[in-house]
Swiss-Prot record:
Transmembrane segments: none annotated. Heteromultimer composed of small subunits (RfcS) and large subunits (RfcL). It comes from Pyrobaculum islandicum (strain DSM 4184 / JCM 9189 / GEO3). This is Replication factor C large subunit. The keyword Protein biosynthesis does not apply. Keywords: ATP-binding, DNA replication, Nucleotide-binding. InterPro entries: AAA+_ATPase, ATPase_AAA_core, P-loop_NTPase, Rep_factor-C_lsu, RFC_lid. ATP binds at G63, P64, P65, G66, I67, G68, K69, T70. PANTHER family: CHROMOSOME TRANSMISSION FIDELITY FACTOR 18 (PTHR23389), REPLICATION FACTOR C SUBUNIT 1 (PTHR23389:SF6). Belongs to the activator 1 small subunits family. RfcL subfamily. NCBIfam families: PRK04195.1-5.
Length: 423
């Protein structure tokens, strides 16, 4: 597989990072004031002497996706010859784990040729503070005692829960890149790839990227895939036309009728593809398409494997597993051995599960309100009400209907609601 251009063209030096001069000056001034760094680098970049910069304990780089936050730290480490110890939100879910990784990184001797170590907590706003057993506190603790530079990045660190990080670190805001900045980088890449790219085409890519250079570079690579050496504005329009909004019926039809694995897999690139919805539809349409039990079993087996990946993603936020789930649920159910010729028209039914959820929405809402009311008034958790109390009350109510009225009076809730819930 071709190397992604976002990696191939990731700037290696401070100089190559486009239009983030202020951020580069501030970051370099902080590093040069507090840590060992090459003289030439400091002379070129460390232009600021503000107290708040030179005394900061750590740095938090903030700004929208794809504008160079991670890149600037990688380039800095290379410029000052520091070894990078990098953690992202999925590594740093628990305080314990953070301490393990950072501690091990700091204890081990640096590889030959490095002057020191630099800790990067990438995308700290990906931390779900409540569930993150101590993640945030541990980062603050590490910053307090660290003798090495600690840098964090975040798309949106302004949520009140990240206040401890903002308080302890110097926040450096990176700018959203302009359309011209993005076009400039794309033009350089075209030249380097030996491709002739129309200015208008590059502008159109830049416009839809909304300043996210990563997205723009990825789009350019897609347009110039399979060795194409010319990019015109018509190519861009054509791809837009090739990717119309599809209904779920059309998506399913394309998946089941795909002739190759890749053809089915590629449907996930359509802008209207919603994998969670698709999954529900796939679950119920397999028997409509495959009448043969053996084929049905194969398709369900693949879908169940995809479901295992999805379960794991939901639990651990390991989003890098999503491609496996998609391959199994698209290519996997489309390409079964000895697939029969499909009839020209297949009637895909609306998933019963969605219908049921829609029908029972009101009942579920009432039940939820009642559970909440019971939990609050009886000073127990909602899960206790759902998992235990309701069964006890229901068993009593089956023998003695008067409990419904008594509960209704005591709690001030309609007797019918209580009856529906318990019986
Ligand atoms: N200012 C920039 N100058 C040059 N290239 C850039 C710049 N910003 C981003 N890029 C390109 O975009 C890619 C993604 O950048 P980077 O990973 O640094 O984004 P980010 O701001 O950290 O985004 P996220 O918050 O999504 O991680 C880089 O590999 C690089 O190719």
């Amino acid at each position: 597989m071709a190397i992604p251009w976002v990696e191939k063209y990731r700037p290696k030096t401070f100089e190559e990072i486009v239009n983030q001069e202020e951020a580069k000056y501030t970051l370099a001034s902080w590093i040069c004031a507090k840590f060992k760094a090459p003289r030439e680098f400091c002379t070129r970049w460390a232009k600021k002497k503000d107290k708040e910069i030179v005394e900061a304990k750590a740095v938090l780089l903030a700004g929208p996706p794809g504008i160079g936050k991670t890149t600037i730290v990688h380039a800095l480490a290379r410029e000052i010859k520091y070894e990078l110890i990098e953690l992202n939100a999925s590594d740093v879910r628990t305080g314990e784990r953070i301490k393990q990784v950072v501690g091990r990184g700091l204890r081990e001797a640096s590889l030959f040729g490095y002057e020191g170590k630099l800790v990067l907590f990438d995308e700290v706003d990906g931390l779900h503070v409540k569930e993150d057993l101590g993640g945030l506190e541990t980062i603050v603790e590490i910053i307090e005692i660290a003798k090495v530079p600690v840098i964090m990045t975040a798309n949106n660190p302004y949520d009140p829960k990240f206040r401890p990080l903002r308080d302890i670190a110097l926040v450096i805001n990176l700018k959203r890149l302009s359309e011209d900045d993005v076009v400039e980088v794309l033009r350089r890449i075209c030249a380097n790839e030996g491709a002739k790219c129309e200015e208008e085409a590059l502008r159109s890519i830049a416009k839809s990227s909304l300043g996210d250079l990563r997205a723009a570079i990825n789009d350019l690579q897609m347009y110039l895939s399979s060795g194409k050496k010319i990019l015109t504005v018509d190519d861009i329009k054509r791809v837009g036309e090739r990717n119309p909004q599809l209904s779920m019926f059309e998506i399913l039809d394309r998946v089941y009728r795909a002739r190759w694995f890749d053809e089915a897999r590629a449907i996930s690139f359509n802008p209207s593809f919603d994998w969670e919805q698709y999954f529900l539809w796939a679950l119920e349409t397999i028997p409509t398409v495959y009448k043969d039990l053996e084929l049905m079993a194969i398709a369900y087996d693949r879908l169940s494997k995809a479901d295992m990946f999805l379960g794991r993603i939901k639990k651990t936020q390991e989003w890098e597993l999503l491609p496996y789930a998609l391959e199994l649920s698209l290519g996997g159910i489309s390409q079964v051995k000895n697939k029969p010729r499909l009839p020209p028209f297949i009637k895909y039914g609306f998933p019963q599960r969605l219908l049921l959820l829609a029908k029972s929405k009101e009942a579920r809402r009432r039940r939820e309100a009642l559970v909440e009311y019971l939990a609050q008034n009886l000073h127990v958790s909602k899960s206790f009400v759902k998992s235990e109390l309701i069964y006890v009350l229901s068993a009593i109510a089956k023998k003695d209907h008067s409990i419904i009225d008594r509960l209704s009076k005591a709690l001030g809730i309609n007797a019918l609601d209580i009856k529906n819930l318990l019986l």
